[in-house]
From Swiss-Prot:
Interacts with klp9. Residues 560-596 have a biased composition (Low complexity). It comes from Schizosaccharomyces pombe (strain 972 / ATCC 24843). Residues 483-497, 505-520, 527-547, 597-609 have a biased composition (Polar residues). The modification Phosphoserine is found at residue 537. PANTHER family: FASCETTO-RELATED, PROTEIN REGULATOR OF CYTOKINESIS 1 PRC1-RELATED. This is Anaphase spindle elongation protein 1. Gene3D superfamilies: 1.20.58.1520.
Amino acid sequence: MQTVMMDDIQSTDSIAEKDNHSNNESNFTWKAFREQVEKHFSKIERLHQVLGTDGDNSSLFELFTTAMNAQLHEMEQCQKKLEDDCQQRIDSIRFLVSSLKLTDDTSSLKIESPLIQCLNRLSMVEGQYMAQYDQKLSTIKEMYHKLESYCNRLGSPFVLPDFENSFLSDVSDAFTESLRGRINEAEKEIDARLEVINSFEEEILGLWSELGVEPADVPQYEQLLESHTNRPNDVYVTQELIDQLCKQKEVFSAEKEKRSDHLKSIQSEVSNLWNKLQVSPNEQSQFGDSSNINQENISLWETELEKLHQLKKEHLPIFLEDCRQQILQLWDSLFYSEEQRKSFTPMYEDIITEQVLTAHENYIKQLEAEVSANKSFLSLINRYASLIEGKKELEASSNDASRLTQRGRRDPGLLLREEKIRKRLSRELPKVQSLLIPEITAWEERNGRTFLFYDEPLLKICQEATQPKSLYRSASAAANRPKTATTTDSVNRTPSQRGRVAVPSTPSVRSASRAMTSPRTPLPRVKNTQNPSRSISAEPPSATSTANRRHPTANRIDINARLNSASRSRSANMIRQGANGSDSNMSSSPVSGNSNTPFNKFPNSVSRNTHFESKSPHPNYSRTPHETYSKASSKNVPLSPPKQRVVNEHALNIMSEKLQRTNLKEQTPEMDIENSSQNLPFSPMKISPIRASPVKTIPSSPSPTTNIFSAPLNNITNCTPMEDEWGEEGF
């Protein structure tokens, strides 16, 4: 036991020596205590030997341990308290630095030994920061109390900042400036509300004066007047006070407006009665003030109105005639029909009574209410009516053939005005008609009757005008027509293709293995010196230059030579008339000559008689031994269009009859003209050579169809070379 005790003492001694070696090198108290303890232990051991006891010193060691533990605990508590105080000072310093928004570094603040000196040093630093904090906090509190008084005067909408959460944790210069800004804002709000209150009070006092209100009639008159003249500095300017004054102002303003309207209605009625009764202006000017709205002035006007009503009963015919004139004007503005006008029977009665006049006046009010309710709709109707009137004037002026040739003083701006009216109609009339359709529909649904425009339903007129007109024959009409050698699809043509004429052609025999290729670019035009009539060779033009022209051979024939000259000339002239016509609405039609062979399609070229320029190349047709090409031509075909214009439909009928007289029994495949305006090139005769539908091929072996061409051409031996539009030689 003694050995363990000594070991504990030695271990404690070693720990103490390690902890206090640097600070207590000159302190020998613990060594002296240890020496005394060792002496005591040596004496105790000798006494145990002398006494012969077992050497039990447990009670002594227990007392010694208890004393040491008590001392150790006391010192540990003291250390902990000093450390807590130091940490509290550090936290306080950091809070003050944060509240002051300083840039000082507080991370170096630590608890160091010795603790008493560390605590003293931290307390000194805390005092320095606390002085700055207290100074700024006192300034902020003064500003806060001032702001609090302002907020009390302004009322609940103007809320104070939170005292605990706002500036106690922030006493920086930025927060001070923000608080000062709030004070300035409150002062401005007080001034603004004072101005509003003063304005309301002045207006209320003015309204009382205009309405003739006496102080005895209004309980708060004296209080309001005293507040307006002698207002204290700390008066409350809450929003409730402003709302109360605003309500009072609205009440008296409504009373003023009511009296003003009543007075104006009386004055208007009195003025109308004065004019109808022919009261002299001097008597009118001598009457009371027209702008005063007090009760006395209104009573004077009411008395005058009663007198005039008595005179009105004595002059009913004058008033009845005036009412009927007003009704006629309202009828015109509402575009009433005759049936609607006749529905008001008092208009056509000869009885003149006060009840009839009252019925007229009530009907006028009804019509005026209808005009007011349909103001926007009627303005659109008037716009449409003005356009229709301009259209009628334009038609009347255009139908007058002598407007430009009449003698005497002429109108040089007539054509310019007509053109302006025409442009205005084309620009605005469709737009107005499209806008009228939903408006008229809604009007008819509201009123339960049809809106008539000069006894005609305007909705039907607008719907018919806005629907696209069919400029061409419908598909059903085309299906019911008897089939001829060729058919032309002109329904879907563009306006630029309406003047083109489609020429029927014989079915070309095309190789099944070779499809139609894209058109080739035509060669430059070369004057045809051999034949003045433009014919088409039996073969399409080649891609070579004009230097490599083809030479005539025995097996190439000129089909045009076999045609009747007279029939060729007539058909060519009709084709030229249809092609060179200036009517853009002409539809394409098939053309045929008076011969045994129907015309083939013309190759693409540039016409001399049109202002169009073909940009499409010449189509490249595949040839077979039995394929022939022909063109309606004559020896003396004029290059300029004839003076007489042939209508396309008329030419269609004539040439269809000629085609039937040829007794062609073969089944000619139907042709469709290409619908696309971009893929449809121009030809000299305004004929499109491009097919839209697949072309039926004719077999190369002899057939009843090919016999038509081979029968009359067996003994032809002399063939003359010809040139087409591109300078290519043909036969």
